[in-house]
């Protein structure tokens, strides 16, 4: 279903890009009904469990429980995170594009960057630009890509590539962005001025939102760059 992103202005004049629709609901309206243990991992579409047997540096045999992706691409990378920077040519400061999305495992609404799994036959660049278009409606240009990073290596083998994309907000195709969300996706996009990003994450945390580690790591990096005068 196609949904239009409608621009609204908050009380502090920060520019927000909210997904508005009479059909789609707000992420905050979702709630957990039940959580039950799964006895057979075959019941799970996206995730499996493994018992890993390995030898430690002293040669002792040990076991490790691990969650695993069942959808890994042939390239060995599960997905992409898209660090999206909105660029203006009228003197407005750069902004970072973020999302609000209800995540059942943490029982709350997460602050995230656009992201998604790499489809079969896709490369990282294609997947990043496709996911950006589907989730936000924007068309952008890839600036850089990170090495493959692992989200929680003590728990799971899931990994991703962090792709930095710039969106030229003066281009006609970015004036009225149209998302292409799946029926089970309820995503609200908003933007924050890049230089205010670390402070805004603190405020969102205080409001009860869950911060995705990738988002907070970027905010912390900006804060450290300022603190230690890194150029």
From Swiss-Prot:
Binding site for Mg(2+) 3: 131, 135, 185
GO terms assigned for molecular function: ADP-ribose diphosphatase activity; metal ion binding
InterPro entries registered for this protein in UniProt: NUDIX_hydrolase-like_dom_sf, NUDIX_hydrolase_CS, NUDIX_hydrolase_dom
Cofactor requirements of the protein: Mg(2+); Mn(2+)
Positions that bind substrate: 46, 64-65, 69, 103, 117, 152
Nudix hydrolase domain residues: 75-214
GO terms of biological process kind: nucleoside phosphate metabolic process; ribose phosphate metabolic process
Superkingdom to which the source organism belongs: Eukaryota
Residues where Mg(2+) 2 binds: 131
SUPFAM superfamilies found in the cross-reference section: Nudix (SSF55811)
Family that this chain belongs to: Belongs to the Nudix hydrolase family. NudF subfamily.
More details: Present with 7330 molecules/cell in log phase SD medium.
Protein name as it appears in the record: ADP-ribose pyrophosphatase
Organism from which the protein derives: Saccharomyces cerevisiae (strain ATCC 204508 / S288c)
Lineage summary: Eukaryota, Fungi, Dikarya, Ascomycota, Saccharomycotina
